[in-house]
Amino acid sequence: MASTVPFSPAKVQMFQATNCHGHAGFGSSFAVPRTGPRPRSVAVRVSSEQEAAATVRAPSGRSIEECEADAVAGRFPAPSCVCQTPKAPDGTPEIRPLDMAKRPRRNRRSPALRAAFQETSISPANLVLPLFIHEGEEDAPIGAMPGCFRLGWQHGLLAEVYKARDVGVNSFVLFPKVPDALKSPTGVEAYNDNGLVPRTIRLLKDKFPDIIVYTDVALDPYSSDGHDGIVRKDGVILNDETVYQLCKQAVSQARAGADVVSPSNMMDGRVGAIRSALDAEGFNDVSIMSYTAKYASSFYGPFREALDSNPRFGDKKTYQMNPANYREALLETAADEAEGADILLVKPGLPYLDIIRLSRDNSALPIAAYQVSGEYSMIKAGGALNMIDEEKVMMESLMCLRRAGADVILTYFARQPPAVLCGMGTAK
């Protein structure tokens, strides 16, 4: 008889994964390059003797046909072993099993089953890495945030982005540490086209054209008063005048190449005004991630140290939300969605899981959560004191944010979950 088998003289190049994309299922694909002509079919004559020698036999030496005949006749081999239930410890009461049709533990009894039925997952696509930047060349550690630095806006910044991309993280949000000499009551440095943030955006987009760059739209890093808006002589934060400045800031960032502008200041009407300003300048494709439910939280302390942006007087309770309020988030969600927001963000994250779920249930827009500096520092401190397992608590906290309904998470841990999922341990 004649059999047709493929024959190819081509040499196939070896390939291997260079990072966790290759072995963690993060959406990577590999093309196997070939050289030489296309494979062709060659007829090979097989003799009857060769065909008989190729008859497949079971490990016992008997052919498949013989085994099938035994099965039809009801002759089955004896099992090699009989599985027995392990013995319970002495003193365990002997009882009749409970009469239950449903036992949820059945679906949790092995790692394979638990993985098969897991409802929530985390991937690098769900993570956004915040980056603190400053004008200096050297990276400066942030005391209240172990492992975080104010990055030199060129070398240190690029190194951090390279590390994140190595584990599949391609989204970044920028927060500038602005010199005091550039701060003013009206925050005019916020829309300087040659300022720190626009220069950083251009640098990143030149080196990594495919990354997603989020920017913060707020005056507090640029304000000599440390507030998110212009402060009147009597201490009142001016809303509409601040929104005017924010529009110029957002346009400046979009002009530099920002993909997503993120108004975090909680001024009324800011989203609609920024959307109109962007569209008027031709930036119809630039998205807006609104800090929809940003609470006046005590969890922001380390962040404000990182940027030296603490209010010089008072607090931010006249514009940020009361932590005691739940229904108010519905008002903010409806307003921002109507004004043209593309993404709705809840901040802080873990203490406000109910607000994340509320937003998820009441909007079809993507929901973001910010695991803020205080949440990060608590986990780091607990791990350093060996009071908790830092890696496990970090993963659980992020999984909880995803389970509550967050599509994306802004977190200072962003480089670590992909490394953990790859089996490489916490990224350094």
From Swiss-Prot:
Keywords: Allosteric enzyme, Chlorophyll biosynthesis, Chloroplast, Heme biosynthesis, Lyase, Magnesium, Metal-binding, Plastid, Porphyrin biosynthesis, Transit peptide
Cofactor(s) required for function per UniProt: Mg(2+)
Binding site for 5-aminolevulinate 1: 304, 316
Cofactor note: Binds 2 magnesium ions per monomer. The first magnesium ion is required for catalysis. The second functions as allosteric activator.
Metabolic or biological pathway: Porphyrin-containing compound metabolism; protoporphyrin-IX biosynthesis; coproporphyrinogen-III from 5-aminolevulinate: step 1/4
GO MF entry, a single one: zinc ion binding
Gene Ontology BP term (one): chlorophyll biosynthetic process
Stretches assigned to coiled coil: none
Pfam families documented for this protein: ALAD
Localization of this protein: Plastid, Chloroplast
This protein's record includes keyword Transit peptide: yes
Ligand binding (Mg(2+)): 332
Primary location: plastid
GO cellular component: chloroplast; cytosol
Binding sites annotated in the UniProt record for 5-aminolevulinate 2: 373, 412
EC number: 4.2.1.24
Active-site residues, as the UniProt record annotates them: 294 (schiff-base intermediate with substrate), 347 (schiff-base intermediate with substrate)
Superkingdom as given in the UniProt entry: Eukaryota
NCBIfam families, per the entry: PRK09283.1
Assembly mode: Homooctamer.
Family of the protein in this entry: Belongs to the ALAD family.
Purpose of the protein: Catalyzes an early step in the biosynthesis of tetrapyrroles. Binds two molecules of 5-aminolevulinate per subunit, each at a distinct site, and catalyzes their condensation to form porphobilinogen.
Name the UniProt record assigns to this protein: Delta-aminolevulinic acid dehydratase, chloroplastic
Originating organism: Hordeum vulgare (Barley)
Gene coding for it: HEMB
